[in-house]
């Protein structure tokens, strides 16, 4: 069989982080080891019944099995606008400032196609979701890193970026609550970022996939669209995947500056055929009726977080107590690199975790635990780690 070479843009990519982890996990499982996966952030709990029932009803409508609108059902976009108004007190025009996505990863990956030309400077903040940099490089963008350091509360040091860089920058990707560090950004950070972006005409791309996964009602994560002036320069990606246990459904939204939303929409109308309408109808129900469910989910994850933090502290592993996200971000024990520690834990105990350096060099010295198994399995996982 002929072996064809990859395009240069693919040939230079490092292996995708989670694909590498899956390979080692399969090798360990083949030895008969009981695997506890704390790697990928994929909720273990089912989609709520009321959303599934809504999908069943929507799937019975013949019209929903035809091609959907490229921009998404207006009814879904209206419900997104309603939810933003209720949750963040943000006014959105559902016709021009909301776009339906086939999952937020799809929208984030397509965004540079619309707005990044070869040679454009793109700022990313590692440790972070690898797609920001990969998608930008695919379009010929030049990626510059603003590292997230623990001593700066895992916020990029905006003051360390000189005026010339801001003038040259096309866009900056930020993500709060943050994956993988679980950090939250205060209003003052967003205000400063939006001020800089407006001054230098920089696009702010905010990945807000974890805003509903918080543990303190008195410190709820912000939407960047709450910040005065954000509508001038920002687009925000949000998703139903994590809060509603709908990762496999692939339904999300982009909101914000109308020209940014329209540009992304133009890419999508040429690259995909929209989200299944029955899923959009079910998502309407989730956004409209899901507040009580979300409160229950937050309680479950809060207990899991506390279980992991207590167990890690007991064996001498230190970490901050996260106030949001599905993750615990902890330092590796002295004498290990991130990859060495995570690989040893997986090979000797069957516990899957994510090495911090998989999110960029700034993540070296850390590992990430996903809170996506029940308390009993979490305790068992940390017990196995302690046995090393």
Swiss-Prot record:
Substrate binds at residues 16, 41, 105, 129, 179, 368. Keywords: Aminotransferase, Pyridoxal phosphate, Transferase. GO terms for biological process: lysine biosynthetic process via diaminopimelate. It is an enzyme of class 2 (transferase). Disulfide bonds: none annotated. Its cofactor is pyridoxal 5'-phosphate. The modification N6-(pyridoxal phosphate)lysine is found at residue 242. InterPro entries: Aminotransferase_I/II_large, DAP-NH2Trfase_DapL_Desulfo, DapL/ALD1, LL-DAP_aminotransferase, NHTrfase_class1_PyrdxlP-BS, PyrdxlP-dep_Trfase, PyrdxlP-dep_Trfase_major, PyrdxlP-dep_Trfase_small. This is LL-diaminopimelate aminotransferase. Its EC number is 2.6.1.83.
């Amino acid at each position: 069989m002929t072996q064809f070479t990859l395009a240069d843009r693919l040939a230079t990519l490092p292996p995708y982080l989670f694909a590498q982890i899956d390979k080692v996990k399969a090798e360990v499982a083949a030895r008969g080891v009981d695997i506890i996966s704390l790697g990928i952030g994929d909720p273990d709990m089912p989609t709520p019944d009321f959303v599934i029932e809504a999908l069943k009803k929507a799937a019975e409508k013949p019209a929903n099995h035809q091609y959907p609108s490229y921009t998404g059902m207006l009814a879904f976009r209206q419900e997104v606008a309603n939810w933003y108004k209720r949750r963040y007190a943000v006014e959105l025009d559902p016709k021009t400032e909301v776009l339906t996505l086939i999952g937020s990863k799809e929208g984030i990956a397509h965004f540079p196609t619309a707005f990044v030309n070869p040679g454009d400077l793109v700022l990313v903040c590692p440790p972070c979701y690898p797609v920001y940099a990969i998608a930008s490089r695919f379009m010929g963008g030049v990626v510059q890193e603003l590292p997230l350091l623990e001593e700066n509360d895992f916020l990029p040091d905006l003051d360390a970026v000189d005026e010339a860089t801001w003038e040259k920058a096309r866009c900056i990707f930020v993500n709060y609550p943050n994956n993988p560090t679980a950090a939250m950004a205060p209003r003052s950070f967003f205000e400063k970022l939006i001020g800089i972006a407006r001054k230098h005409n920089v696009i702010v791309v905010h990945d807000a996939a974890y805003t509903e996964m918080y543990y303190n009602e008195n410190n709820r994560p912000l939407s960047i669209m709450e910040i005065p002036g954000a509508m001038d320069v920002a687009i925000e990606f949000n998703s139903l995947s994590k809060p509603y246990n709908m990762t496999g459904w692939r339904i999300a939204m982009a909101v914000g500056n109308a020209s940014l939303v329209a540009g992304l929409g133009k890419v999508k109308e040429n690259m995909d055929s929209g989200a299944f309408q029955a899923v959009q109808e079910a998502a309407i129900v989730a956004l409209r009726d899901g507040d009580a469910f979300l409160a229950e989910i937050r309680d479950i994850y809060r207990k899991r977080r506390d279980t992991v933090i207590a167990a890690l502290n007991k064996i001498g592993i230190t970490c901050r107590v996260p106030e949001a996200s599905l993750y615990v971000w902890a330092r590796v024990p002295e004498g290990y690199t991130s990859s060495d520690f995570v690989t040893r834990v997986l090979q000797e105990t069957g516990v899957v975790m994510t090495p911090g350096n998989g999110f960029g060099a700034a993540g070296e010295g850390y590992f990430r635990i996903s809170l996506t198994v029940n308390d009993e399995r979490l305790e068992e996982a940390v017990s196995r780690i302690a046995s090393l």
